[in-house]
Amino acid sequence: MSNDIRSLGKSGKKFTNWATTYSCTPELYFEPETEDEIRKILAYAQEKDKKVKVVGFGHSPSDIACTTDFMISLCRYNNVIKVDKEKLQVTVQGGCLLKELNDHVLPANDMALSVQGAVCDLTAAGVISTGTHGTGAQFGIISSYVVNLELMKASGEVITINEEVNSELLPAAALSLGSLGVIISVTLQCEKAFRLHCKQVTNTLQNVIENLDVYVTSSDHFKFFWYPHTESVVCFNTNRTKEEPKVKSSWIWDMGVGYYLLQILLWFSTFFPSLVPSINRLYFKLFCSSSVERIDRSDKIFNFNCLFKQYVMEWSIPRNKVGVVLWELKEWIEKNRFPAHFPVEVRFVKGDNIYLSPCYDQDSCYINIIMYRPFNTLVSHETYWNEYQSIVAKHGGRPHWAKDHNFTGTEFIKLYPKWNEFCAIREKMDPNGMFLNANLERVFNSRPSPSRNHV
């Protein structure tokens, strides 16, 4: 069997994440198509005393997917298993892309996911394993919509987890960082298909912060972008609607100016950083100075173009800490004249009871900072990242699991009331740590091993 399984793997395969900020070369790279193949790969890994890392589409802008041992991509394990139109639930294999659900499966059955993030090129397993979220005060992270999981343990045993079977595992398995096993299938609770009406309006940072609760609760899915080096904010007030679609687009404007020209200007700013404040002001004036309305299918409003390669860092904080964090960040940027790119994205998520959820037991706000990498150029960002982390850490910040952070179990045990409970479940499910890589070894305070290259 060993030779048969080894022949399924590729050696010398380099894995690079979408942002091209992390890469690794696993000893063997697998793309299994069946549950039995996954089981045999795990058995072979045990035989050879190898770690196993399961990866999706590679959108995580950190080293969470990297390993030098065995890597399993679920890109071929991606079928839709069942659509239950009565319960409004969809069951898929772990590698099924949200894009497939959005474009084909859910519209064909008059269904939709209740909330989504910015990107749809994500696997179902990856979305729930890293705590992917959208925005909306009454909407949780996508993991909170999990109603059933089938999980393959390191032993090859597949267990079912839901509110009736192994229910004690559900708060851990719904967001596990891939540390409990391989997600064979996941069932997500959906709702009837719906359209969204997004009204984009300008505002000031001070006004939004002073009236934050009003803004957050007056829309189904409220978020705002702050443009550093300005007082300017663009608010996105998004609500469900039965109105007909209303979409206006221009390739020249959206791509020519909004993508290609911006990339050129930001590339010049790598030589002349003092240009960044002017670029931020220019693009706010070009794209945000007037009100814009869009009505479209829900996923087309939730998802948006993330433009070109980038560094990002995102933290979740208690909702009542938004003002103090943003004012401290703004003050630091201005005092140090750091050329911070736009936007600082601010979103809002309902609290939940998932052990490793950044929203555990609190309604939360996610604040995402960004530094673009025009034409894949290396851009200085470390001091910005370190300062932002120090600011949010003072105010109970919890990092987005898919993104860069320097925290370890020492910090997490103080931030997550159910940290010890999760660790006990992980050690029982995977006693030999097969599913740990360097990223997770840092998180759980095990001995780290090199697994990635960083740029």
PLM segments and residue spans:
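Noncatalytic alpha-helical scaffold of FAD-dependent oxidoreductases
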Residues: 1-455
